[in-house]
């Protein structure tokens, strides 16, 4: 059986992540319209899956973020203006990758403080991006407050999921590093077995 190339592996992984984002975002948005109908809040899985993708694939995380934003707007019956604000404003999430210029991605998995900082910065950059994209239509500082407040449940959900998933092997890990690690472990295991007479 022919082995996958790194590029093929990345494409498959990103496709799965985007499909998961689309399905769960549609379910969450549809459910929120009933459960949170009297509250100025929504819950989204897009932030969670985008954070996981950023750790795994860096800037390719723009894919699930765009998909999630598009599906949210589609299911919630958004206007063209809202499509623009959410789909393009959410791309500001990538600014939180600057955190990894100073801190190892491994810290997201091992340190709660770093994990919280990473998710919070991603969340805030998304809110700021949406606000900036809304400025051509309406200049108001109240808008950014609304963006931050309405998605607060999504922030909490993302922190909880990433904390629960931190021990899942390879899930919250840079995939290039992960593949190199498991290949090294495989070689070491083969060497150990070759010296074992039994």
Predicted regions and their residues:
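Membrane-embedded alpha-helical hairpins and interfacial helices in multi-pass inner-membrane proteins
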Residues: 30-40, 79-89, 99-198
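Membrane-helix boundary elements
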Residues: 63-85
């Amino acid at each position: 059986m022919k082995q996958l190339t790194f590029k093929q592996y990345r494409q498959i992984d990103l496709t799965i992540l985007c499909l998961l984002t689309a399905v769960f975002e549609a379910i969450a948005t549809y459910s929120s319209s009933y459960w949170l109908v009297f509250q100025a809040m929504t819950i989204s899985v897009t932030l969670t899956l985008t954070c996981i993708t950023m750790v795994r694939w860096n800037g390719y995380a723009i894919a699930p973020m765009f998909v999630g934003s598009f599906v949210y707007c589609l299911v919630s019956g958004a206007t063209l203006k809202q499509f623009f604000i959410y789909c393009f404003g959410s791309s500001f999430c990538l600014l939180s990758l600057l955190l990894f210029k100073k801190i190892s991605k491994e810290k997201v998995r091992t340190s709660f403080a770093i994990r919280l900082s990473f998710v919070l910065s991603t969340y805030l950059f998304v809110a700021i991006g949406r606000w900036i994209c809304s400025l051509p239509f309406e200049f108001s500082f109240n808008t950014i407050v609304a963006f931050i407040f309405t998605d607060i449940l999504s922030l909490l959900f993302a922190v909880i999921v990433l904390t629960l998933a931190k021990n899942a092997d390879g899930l919250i890990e840079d995939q290039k590093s992960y593949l190199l690690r498991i290949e090294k472990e495989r070689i070491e295991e083969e060497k150990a077995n070759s010296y074992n007479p039994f």
